[in-house]
Each structure stands twice: as C-alpha cells, then as structure tokens.
C-alpha cells in the first residue's frame, strides 16, 4: 500500500484563476530522492561496524542534516562536490562515535561516499504517479521544473525518469545564478515557459524554498506533503496534497473550478 492521498484545499478564492502553467520542484516532489538516499545509506552500513548498529531512521536524519548543510556550500561554490561528499561521511561517522584514528586518513569517508553514490544512482525512481500526472497536465498547461542543485545531476535525473520529454522549461540554480526561495529563479522559469505569475502554480515539498519562494514571486503554491509534516503557521490558505495520485484528484486541486481537469 502507498501513501494515503490527502487533498487539503484552504483558500478557494485563489483557485478561480485560470491556470496556464505548472512548476514543480524535482527532488522529493517528482524524483524520489528520499527513497534513493535511504537505500544508499544501507550500503554505507557495511563500511564500519559502528554504523551498522545505528537505527535506520536516526541514520537518515543525521545524514540529511549534514547533506543539507554541505549542499548549500556546494551551491555557493565554497566546496567542491567531491570534497563535500567526503566531508559528509566524515561528519556522519564522527557524530556516530567512530574513532578519530579510523577517520584520520580519509579512506573510510571516501569509501562510504563511493558506496553511497553507487547505490544512490542504482535506486533512482520517480515519486509514484509523477509521470502520469505530467502526461495528464501536458495537454492543458505549460510545465516546468525549478530545482536547487547542480545542473548535471538534475538533468541526469530528468532524463533517467523520462520527465524531460514532458517539460517546457527547466531552471536549475547552478545555471540560473539564483536559488529558491529567491524570486529571481522563479521569474526565470516564468520567462522560459512563458507564463505570468498569476496564472502559474508551483508544487513542491519544501515549505521554506518552494512555497515561500513561489508566493514571494506572486504565484499560487501547492504544498506536496507526503510525510504529513505539521503545517507551518504562515499562509494557512496554501493548499496541500500528500500524493501525486489519483491524478484526477490532483488535477482538481491544481485547476479548481476550471473544467480542463475533466
């Protein structure tokens, strides 16, 4: 059984607008990064006995926090990608109590980074329902992706999942020179579609970057919240979905009273 769909609409006045374009976040909205990362961490367990004993959810939480912090430094060009990958596992292992002697020469961190990356790529998949939703939207709207990441990585994911054939615009922070939540990256996406902010919906899982950024750019936003995370206090009128299927239900949230969803 998958995630039980939950569609929350609060703020019907916004749904009356004619929608001509839909923007998506990529990681953990269309592309299932969470699944690939968790599978990859299982490969990392084999690198050291201490790591093998750690609870999977705790390992995932610790890794995600370090990944996010270093990811921002990579995007800011403060670290190379290879250095960040090695540093990520050095910090992770250090936090789990792996001895300084085991970490001293960097070999353990490099081995873990290689194991993670190899399994991560092997575990790539779409979020369930992503392709079906893109296909259903395509006859009615222009579709784009706005993502904070390195360009090559994201283009590879788009091609692997086949999303690229459904898209009218792809804007990635490394190429754009701006990152979500900066309205500038959303404006670039609107120019490439092309579309106006008032006729565009942004769908993403990250409140601080996807939702806040889209709203700052003048767009309506739909929060993709598959884990059922508690809603932040701000903007109670933001609509919420917890799955990308069934497609007709998602289309209903996107289009509101517009009969194109039929």
Language model regions located:
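N-terminal helical cap/lid subdomain that shapes the substrate entry/recognition surface
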Residues: 16-128
């Amino acid at each position: 059984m998958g995630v039980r769909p939950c569609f929350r609409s609060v703020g019907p006045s916004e749904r009356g607008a004619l929608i001509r374009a839909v923007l998506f976040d990529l990681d953990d909205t269309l592309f299932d990064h969470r699944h690939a990362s968790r599978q990859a961490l299982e490969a990392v367990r084999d690198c050291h006995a201490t790591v093998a004993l750690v609870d999977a959810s705790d390992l995932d939480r610790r890794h995600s926090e370090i990944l996010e912090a270093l990811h921002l430094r990579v995007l800011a060009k403060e670290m190379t990608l290879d250095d960040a990958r090695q540093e990520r596992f050095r910090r992770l292992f250090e936090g789990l109590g792996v001895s300084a002697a085991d970490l001293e020469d960097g070999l353990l961190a490099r081995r873990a980074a290689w194991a993670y990356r190899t399994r991560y790529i092997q575990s790539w998949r779409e979020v369930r329902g992503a392709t079906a939703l893109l296909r259903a939207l395509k006859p009615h709207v222009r579709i784009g992706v706005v993502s904070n990441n390195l360009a090559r990585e994201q283009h590879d994911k788009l091609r692997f999942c086949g999303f690229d054939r459904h898209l009218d615009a792809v804007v990635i922070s490394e190429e754009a020179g701006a990152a979500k939540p900066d309205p500038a990256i959303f404006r670039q996406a609107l120019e490439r579609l092309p579309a106006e902010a008032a006729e565009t919906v942004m769908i993403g899982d990250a409140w601080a970057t996807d939702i806040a950024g889209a709203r700052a750019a003048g767009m309506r936003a739909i929060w993709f919240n598959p884990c059922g995370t508690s809603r932040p206090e701000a903007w109670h009128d933001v609509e919420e979905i917890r799955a990308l299927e069934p497609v007709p239900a998602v289309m209903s949230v996107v289009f509101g009273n517009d009969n194109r969803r039929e």
